[in-house]
């Protein structure tokens, strides 16, 4: 039984039930302390161990490589740079996506091309991609959402047909499976995020799964501001004092302390997955007969759900948010679509009818490993009493 973070008293006495809460326990604190006491604060042996454990847990194919980096955004940016995405290029991605994806594209001088999503899954609508492809299209970024996975089979067909690489943004789907294969094995590039709110956290961190050995060597240098330092040497808590710089680089490496925390998190993946699956099913059961609300699809076998998002169908989403906040229940909105931000409003886009509708209805409820059945019962009760 996990220690409760909030009590079960009246709403006036309750602590706010947060949308997110990372599972940080004594093991993570001890691992961080041990790493600090060892004195090697940069990239070192724990980073190597973290990469190997991801490889093992996700059953990454032998032809692929894992490169740990500082954030999920860093993983996206490096993936695009490895593909030589440049000014004037276009990258197809759903407008209903995280801002990190759009900013990574812009950081390369390229432009996002916004396409619509599927109403059922909130993932990229694969049937809308081909009409957006031009001679400038150099990449497609597809992101899994919440507990839903993209149609990766059809994405691979599009990739092969047009010779356009896929970057799979799997920030939401770490440790999940698609057609019996773990996420990380579907496309040329897969990126993970281990930020403070993800199912698995390094406090901040990320990783790229690469399908070519040459990409691995380049990514290892690029994450170290372009220095061709031997990764294998640094993985022994050491470094070379002579090296060369052969390409552009960034300060995107993962530190030992973050990797040490991540290693402890990976040991708890089955606990994290099970508690999230249980919470997901409890929410769906309790909310299924409310006429003005729709719940996410229930196909969560072999998945590790990241967020729990409902749709408020009566136009009163913001009223419901205020009502729940007054009852000590925090909520979120994932996300505001990219084409509505000032910085991206002039980017090329096609019919975004589903994106427009969904973005006005979505509401993310509290969903994390510390939650217990009584917390979810309380949230369900409050939603049912909303008038």
Predicted region positions:
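Phosphate-binding glycine-rich loop
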Residues: 43-90, 104-108, 114-116, 181
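Short beta-strand-to-turn element immediately C-terminal to the catalytic PLP-Schiff-base lysine
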Residues: 192-193, 206-212, 263
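Conserved active-site segment immediately N-terminal to the catalytic lysine
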Residues: 168-202, 217, 241-246
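Short, conserved catalytic or interaction motifs in soluble domains
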Residues: 117, 196, 367
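PLP-dependent aminotransferase class I/II
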Residues: 10, 47-53, 60-64, 127, ...
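Structural detector of well-ordered beta-strand residues that form the stable sheet scaffold
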Residues: 67, 92, 113, 166-167, ...
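N-terminal "arm"/small-domain region of PLP-dependent enzymes with the aminotransferase-like
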Residues: 1-41, 244-246, 366
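PLP-dependent aminotransferase-like
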Residues: 81-161, 165-170, 177
């Amino acid at each position: 039984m996990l220690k409760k973070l909030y009590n079960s008293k009246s709403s006036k006495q309750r602590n706010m039930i947060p949308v997110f809460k990372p599972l940080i326990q004594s093991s993570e604190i001890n691992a961080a302390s041990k790493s600090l006491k060892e004195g090697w604060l940069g990239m070192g042996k724990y980073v190597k161990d973290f990469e190997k454990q991801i490889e093992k847990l996700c059953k990454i194919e032998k032809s692929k490589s894992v490169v740990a980096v500082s954030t999920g955004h860093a993983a996206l940016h490096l993936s695009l740079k490895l593909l030589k995405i440049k000014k004037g290029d276009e990258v197809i991605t759903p407008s209903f996506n995280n801002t990190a994806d759009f900013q990574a594209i812009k950081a390369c001088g390229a432009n996002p091309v916004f396409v619509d999503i599927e109403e059922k899954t909130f993932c990229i609508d694969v049937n809308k991609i081909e009409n957006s492809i031009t001679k400038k299209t150099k990449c497609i970024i597809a992101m899994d959402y919440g507990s839903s996975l993209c149609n990766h089979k059809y994405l691979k067909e599009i990739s092969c047909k047009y010779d356009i690489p896929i970057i799979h943004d799997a920030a939401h789907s770490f440790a999940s499976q698609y057609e019996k294969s773990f996420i990380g094995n579907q496309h040329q590039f897969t990126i993970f995020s281990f930020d403070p709110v993800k199912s698995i956290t390094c406090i901040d961190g990320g990783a790229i799964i690469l399908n070519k050995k040459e990409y691995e060597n380049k990514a290892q240098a690029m994450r170290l501001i372009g220095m061709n330092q031997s990764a294998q040497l640094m993985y022994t808590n050491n470094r070379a004092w002579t090296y060369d710089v052969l390409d552009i680089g960034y300060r995107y490496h993962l530190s030992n302390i973050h990797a040490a925390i991540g290693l402890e998190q990976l040991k708890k993946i089955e606990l994290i997955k099970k508690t999230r699956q249980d919470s997901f099913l409890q929410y769906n059961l309790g909310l299924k007969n409310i006429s003005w609300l729709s719940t996410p699809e229930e196909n969560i076998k072999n998945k590790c759900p990241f967020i729990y998002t409902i749709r408020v169908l009566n136009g009163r989403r913001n009223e419901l948010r205020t009502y729940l906040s007054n009852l000590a229940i925090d909520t979120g909105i994932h996300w505001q679509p990219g084409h509505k931000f000032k910085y991206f409003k002039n980017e090329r886009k096609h019919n975004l009818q589903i994106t427009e509708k969904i973005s006005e209805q979505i509401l993310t409820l509290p969903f994390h490993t510390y939650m217990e059945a009584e917390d979810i019962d309380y949230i369900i009760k409050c939603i049912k009493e909303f008038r």
